[in-house]
């Protein structure tokens, strides 16, 4: 599955009375990057073609260290999911300069015009070059001009177990994974961004009920005990808002069992 889930990776429908467990966790959702090597693994109905292949692409499980949205290192992503699009080169963007304050004296800068390049001068980043997409609980969109972009996704964490005063059953939801890749667009494209939601937590009430999974595919948990639901995956879709237009996916972590912590999402297997 391309999402975190409980009790099984990829579950996207509400759990039933026969699903869920008070004592066991489950796999997290797998990640995916659309490349020439992975295209054959795409489910039937894929709406993408070879012009959307990613380069320098990888998907990393949530039990491995990778770069966090803030730029630090994290081993698995906690909380809600996150997505980012960074402009590497955009053919239709105006030239700009950003001068570092450390330049104390007058300096001349020269640019070659009409060469379809975007320039930055100094160590600071141009604010418009990065688009960040935090969790909102709904789809977000952006329109990308022809150019080259770095795509990054962080999957959401699975829901925690509720201790109800017993520290032995305070299990932690599985952490989300990370996926990254570079895409070059030859024409203007609308993209659809889904930042997954963290799984929910259920207290031990003694009666069965459903704990809904996190936004964007987190599996639900049907239990009478204390357990969490799956975290949602984070993904970016190109051209149309369809599951079959996802070019990059970061898997969400699984929910907890009563006494078992959730499994990490992301990577090839989740």
Annotate each language-model stretch with its function.
Residues 43-143:
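Enriched but not universal
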Residues 34-36, 84-91, 182-184, 238-241:
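Short beta-strand-to-coil "C-cap" segments at the C-terminal boundary of structured domains/repeats
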Residues 144-150, 186-190:
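Extended extracellular/luminal ectodomain segments enriched in beta-structured repeat modules
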Residues 89, 155, 197-199:
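Surface-exposed loop/turn motifs at beta-strand-loop junctions within extracellular Ig-like
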Residues 131, 140, 168-170, 180-183:
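Beta-strand-rich interaction surfaces with strong enrichment in secreted/lumenal proteins
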Residues 13-26, 35-73, 203-222:
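Surface-exposed intrinsically disordered loops and tails
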Residues 1-7, 173-270:
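Secretome/extracellular-domain signature
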Residues 160-174:
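Short, surface-exposed beta-strand/strand-loop-strand elements in extracellular ectodomains
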């Amino acid at each position: 599955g391309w999402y975190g889930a409980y009790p099984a990776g990829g579950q996207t429908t509400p759990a039933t009375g026969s699903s869920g467990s008070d004592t066991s966790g489950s796999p997290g959702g797998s990640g995916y990057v659309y490349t020439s090597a992975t295209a054959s693994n795409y489910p039937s109905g894929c709406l993408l073609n070879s012009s959307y292949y990613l380069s320098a692409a990888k998907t990393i499980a949530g039990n491995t260290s990778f770069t966090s949205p803030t730029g630090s290192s994290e081993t698995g992503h906690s909380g809600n999911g996150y997505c980012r699009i960074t402009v590497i080169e955009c053919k239709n963007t105006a030239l700009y300069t950003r001068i570092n304050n450390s330049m104390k004296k007058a300096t001349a800068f020269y640019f070659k015009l009409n060469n379809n390049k975007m320039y930055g001068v100094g160590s600071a980043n141009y604010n418009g070059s990065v688009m960040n997409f935090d969790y909102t609980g709904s789809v977000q969109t952006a329109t990308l001009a022809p150019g080259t972009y770095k795509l990054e996704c962080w999957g959401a964490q699975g829901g925690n177990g509720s201790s109800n005063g017993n520290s032995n059953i305070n299990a932690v939801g599985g952490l989300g994974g990370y996926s990254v890749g570079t895409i070059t667009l030859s024409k203007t494209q609308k993209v659809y961004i889904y930042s997954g939601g963290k799984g929910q937590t259920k207290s031990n009430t003694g009666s069965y009920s459903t704990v809904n999974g996190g936004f964007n595919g987190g599996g639900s948990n049907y239990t009478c005990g204390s357990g969490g639901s799956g975290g949602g995956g984070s993904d970016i879709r190109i051209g149309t808002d369809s599951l079959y237009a996802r070019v990059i996916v970061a898997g969400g972590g699984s929910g907890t069992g009563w006494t078992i912590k959730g499994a990490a999402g992301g990577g090839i297997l989740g």
